[in-house]
Amino acid sequence: MSRTNISALSPMQKLARNPAVIAMTLALALAGCANKKNMPNSAGELGLGGAGSATPGSQQDFTVNVGDRIFFDTDSTSIRADAQQTLQRQAQWLSRYPNYAITVEGHADERGTREYNLALGARRAAATRDFLASQGVPASRMKTISYGKEKPVAVCDDISCWSQNRRAVTVLGGAGM
């Protein structure tokens, strides 16, 4: 291994070999990264997680401020009270933004056969669609699909995972605003 003659190095190369300069550069870089998520973006909104970060009428607005999913009890298609509130907010939002069409996805937990869970997911999606229709959302703007147990959001052999997978998700489509 050959040693480099320090006097032959440029001033930049000499600085790059100085441990204090390296540590200071690293500290400044990390400090800049730590504050980035709190900086306003070009639209004048707060960054991720900040109040007002969702553009009104956007998918993010729908998901964050309204809620895009509801949950079901085991082997049930009944719309629970907490789910009714979410679906009422969805109906109001969809009334405000009439150019969106939606797809209601029905899901089930991993227990049971594939066929049973596809049918259960279809019934959950239909129950969700029917509730939204009862709140004034035109049927022509809605379609349903069942994924059964094929698209879990949580995978484990535990009731906490199963309860997250028993859901209906409202997905926006169409032209939007």
Curated annotation (Swiss-Prot):
Membrane-protein topology: Lipid-anchor
Keyword Membrane (UniProt): yes
Location of the protein in the cell: Cell outer membrane
Entry GO terms, CC: cell outer membrane
Subunit-structure text: The Tol-Pal system is composed of five core proteins: the inner membrane proteins TolA, TolQ and TolR, the periplasmic protein TolB and the outer membrane protein Pal. They form a network linking the inner and outer membranes and the peptidoglycan layer.
Keyword check for Membrane: yes
Keywords annotated in UniProt: Cell cycle, Cell division, Cell outer membrane, Lipoprotein, Membrane, Palmitate, Signal
PROSITE patterns with a match to the protein in the record: OMPA_1 (PS01068), OMPA_2 (PS51123), PROKAR_LIPOPROTEIN (PS51257)
InterPro entries noted in UniProt: Bact_OuterMem_StrucFunc, OMP_bac, OmpA-like, OMPA-like_CS, OmpA-like_sf, Pal, Pal_lipo_C
Name by which UniProt lists this protein: Peptidoglycan-associated lipoprotein
Assigned protein family: Belongs to the Pal lipoprotein family.
Lipidation (N-palmitoyl cysteine): C33
Organism: Agrobacterium fabrum (strain C58 / ATCC 33970)
